[in-house]
């Protein structure tokens, strides 16, 4: 991670000194070195195993069809509209009651 940050900061620093193709090549070399270092370290191998396991689990998921996703989306939109109307009505009642109480003169 530090290597990525150093590469990005170096890219900003060398913006005035070197042209874009040289900076792109330098950034590519820095990224390759960072990936190599990540692959040979203990944390890098754990991260790679985690990503492989995540990909395996994502393949096991039963994803909804387009029709199911559309129906679920419409249900969520409908419930949201009903809830917003309910809260608007409750808010209006509360505001009316408070206005009535604050306008009373004793």
Curated annotation (Swiss-Prot):
GO terms for cellular component: plasma membrane. The keyword Cell inner membrane applies. GO terms for molecular function: protein transmembrane transporter activity. The keyword Cytoplasm does not apply. PANTHER family: PROTEIN TRANSLOCASE SUBUNIT SECE. Essential subunit of the Sec protein translocation channel SecYEG. Clamps together the 2 halves of SecY. May contact the channel plug during translocation. Component of the Sec protein translocase complex. Heterotrimer consisting of SecY, SecE and SecG subunits. The heterotrimers can form oligomers, although 1 heterotrimer is thought to be able to translocate proteins. Interacts with the ribosome. Interacts with SecDF, and other proteins may be involved. Interacts with SecA. This is Protein translocase subunit SecE.
């Amino acid at each position: 991670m530090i290597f990525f940050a150093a590469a990005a900061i170096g890219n900003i620093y060398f913006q005035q000194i070197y042209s874009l193709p040289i900076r792109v090549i330098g950034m590519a070399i820095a990224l390759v070195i960072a990936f190599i270092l990540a692959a040979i370290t203990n944390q890098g191998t754990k991260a790679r195993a985690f990503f492989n396991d995540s990909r395996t689990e994502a393949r096991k998921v039963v994803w909804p069809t387009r029709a199911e996703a559309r129906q679920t989306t419409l249900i969520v939109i409908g419930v949201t509209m009903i809830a917003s109307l309910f809260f608007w009505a409750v808010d209006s009642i509360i505001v009316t009651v408070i206005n009535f109480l604050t306008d009373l003169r004793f």
